[in-house]
């Protein structure tokens, strides 16, 4: 296996994160103290929240389409959809891909209002609804249809994205220009896909499925990373290829996370299933190294930064504090998931644990700790990775 292939494999994410946890338990990390004794209480809390949210424990898989449902309004269930199964899959894949890529942290001040949904929306739900409405209006289509094609994406500017997302001086969205640039890059990449549409990714993925319609989650992730790696031109390179969400960490080498691409992989499982493709080995994917899961561990008392002034400092994604935090998040959520399963007496998948779950618990603790529910660590993000 080449170095690039190894760094795109979820087993490498898990293995490197376990190595980071080993350093933490030995007291050898520069930026964090760890208290594993807090994990059981946190496991019970996540279990209790999961029971409240899903009393029958029929927990759906973590995925973007759940953010299209706000209160009694379910945009996903009522979306425009072609009658042909494969064409419907292309439509769904296009929507999911563009919405996930626009899902990096919005910042604490941004809000979105929708005519059908009461109240102001923010963060993931706000970004989801905003991207859905833009898709519905044909913002991402050269034909004015609710689809996503290369030609339209290649021309997306910051102004048009700002208009679609209701961005103003008093309603700033983190990284609006960078998000627009990301969509333009997606336009260039998807020009090589079938039909020059983002939905053509469905055809590429279905080509990797077996004759019985089975597709390994490892293959799903690898294919996504191979196709989407040009979207992150400023990332670390190996063998002439951009690695994306992979960061140097001298004590352990390169640390891969692929948070946004794994979030996309989780989010595509249901649309692929509806098209007759069963994604297998889903638990080979890892917990997502993002600020809700990671914030749960800080606000829950498992992790404590040791650097004075860490709360008031903006930390780059490449910083030791953030790289250590994200790796510990992956390894510790794996352990937390086992405690949640024991508490519930149910063998939920990792995707169900995240949904049930750790993401919601992280948001709840953040809201209790800080008025705007912002994450405990201020990460300097450009809105395209974290």
Model-predicted regions and their roles:
Residues 108-213:
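Conserved, well-structured core segments that form the ligand-binding/active-site neighborhood
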Residues 2-153:
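An N-terminal, globular interaction/scaffold subdomain
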Residues 110-114, 236-242, 351-352:
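Short coil/turn segments at secondary-structure boundaries
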Residues 82-89, 93, 209-216, 253, ...:
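Non-transmembrane, amphipathic alpha-helical segments
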């Amino acid at each position: 296996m080449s170095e690039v292939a190894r760094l795109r494999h979820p087993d490498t994410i898990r293995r490197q994160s376990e190595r980071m946890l080993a350093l933490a338990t030995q007291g050898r990390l520069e930026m964090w103290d760890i208290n594993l004794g807090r994990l059981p209480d946190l496991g019970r809390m996540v279990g209790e929240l999961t029971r409240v949210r899903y009393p029958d424990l029929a927990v759906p898989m973590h995925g973007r389409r759940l953010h299209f449902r706000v209160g009694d309004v379910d945009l996903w269930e009522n979306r425009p959809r072609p009658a042909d199964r494969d064409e419907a899959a292309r439509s769904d894949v296009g929507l999911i891909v563009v919405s996930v890529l626009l899902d990096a942290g919005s910042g604490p001040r941004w809000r979105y209002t929708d005519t059908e949904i009461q109240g102001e929306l923010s963060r993931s739900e706000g970004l989801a609804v905003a991207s859905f409405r833009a898709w519905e209006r044909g913002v991402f289509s050269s034909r004015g249809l609710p689809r996503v094609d290369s030609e339209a994406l290649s021309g997306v500017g910051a102004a048009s994205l700002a208009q679609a997302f209701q961005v103003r001086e008093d309603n700033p969205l983190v990284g609006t220009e960078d998000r627009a640039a990301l969509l333009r890059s997606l336009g260039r990449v998807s020009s090589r896909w079938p039909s020059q549409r983002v939905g053509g990714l469905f055809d590429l993925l279905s080509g990797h499925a077996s004759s019985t319609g089975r597709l390994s989650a490892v293959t799903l992730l690898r294919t996504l990373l191979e196709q989407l790696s040009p979207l992150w031109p400023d990332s670390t390179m190996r063998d002439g290829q951009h690695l994306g969400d992979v960061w140097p960490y001298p004590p352990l080498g390169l640390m891969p996370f692929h948070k946004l691409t794994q979030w996309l992989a989780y989010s595509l499982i249901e649309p692929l299933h509806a098209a007759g493709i069963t994604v297998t080995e889903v638990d080979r994917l890892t917990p997502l190294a993002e600020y809700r899961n990671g914030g749960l561990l800080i606000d829950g008392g498992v992790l404590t930064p040791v650097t004075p002034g860490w709360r008031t400092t903006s930390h780059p994604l490449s910083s030791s504090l953030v790289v250590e935090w994200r790796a510990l998040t992956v390894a510790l959520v794996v352990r937390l998931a086992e405690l949640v399963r024991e508490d519930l007496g149910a063998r939920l998948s990792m995707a169900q644990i995240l949904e049930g779950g750790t993401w919601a618990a992280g948001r709840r603790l953040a809201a209790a700790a800080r008025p705007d529910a912002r994450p405990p660590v201020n990460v300097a993000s450009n809105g395209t990775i974290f």
